[in-house]
């Protein structure tokens, strides 16, 4: 068990309505430039804070693979799916480095606020490369270490955006870019060219 992993017993915090003030799903969607019909792997999906908005955005021809290593949070996400009548979210109980997804099945491999928890980041990026179709993108959103820790993990656990960018380049992703999203987060993206 990863000691940095967000505890499933605290999953209610993932659905705190105040969260929208500092990380609005609409801002994340705009930054990612998703399109209708796209297939997205939301890795570390948790209770679906972003999975459900992604599902609505990509529409019925799109697909969201909501991947999480904790069955408890996926159970909570399933309840939300049932209540919202969303039909294009598929739950996957798996680790980020072994999602079990088919090769070249996704246009976006997305992770929000889990990068600092991942012990074997290079293995996760290798999995992203396997799962992404040519031209697909990996996107990592995580906590900035240069802001007061009102929310999120301790500053000592946070990762600087430059390290994430370096990891993307080392893993073979091209055209890596970064931006700030919300009050407390950075987002990096890179493209699989082949």
Task: For every predicted segment, state its role.
Residues 122-137:
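A short glycine-rich, Lys/Arg-flanked "PGG" loop and its adjoining helix->strand segment in the class I
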């Amino acid at each position: 068990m990863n000691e940095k992993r967000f505890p499933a017993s605290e999953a209610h915090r993932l659905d705190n309505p105040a969260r929208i003030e500092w990380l609005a799903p609409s801002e994340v969607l705009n930054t990612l430039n998703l399109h209708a019909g796209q297939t997205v792997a939301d890795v570390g999906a948790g209770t679906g804070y972003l999975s459900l908005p992604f599902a609505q955005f990509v529409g019925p021809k799109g697909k969201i693979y909501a991947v999480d290593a904790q069955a408890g949070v996926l159970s909570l996400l399933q309840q939300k799916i049932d209540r919202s009548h969303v039909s294009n979210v598929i739950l996957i109980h798996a680790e980020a480095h072994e999602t079990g997804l088919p090769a070249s099945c996704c246009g976006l491999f997305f992770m929000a606020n889990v990068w600092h928890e991942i012990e074997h980041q290079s293995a996760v990026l290798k999995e992203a490369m396997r799962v992404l179709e040519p031209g697909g993108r990996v996107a990592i959103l995580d906590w900035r270490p240069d802001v007061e820790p009102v929310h999120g993990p301790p500053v000592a656990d946070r990762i600087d955006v430059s390290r994430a960018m370096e990891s993307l380049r080392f893993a073979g992703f091209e055209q890596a870019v970064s931006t700030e999203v919300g009050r407390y987060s950075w987002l990096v993206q890179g493209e699989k060219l082949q």
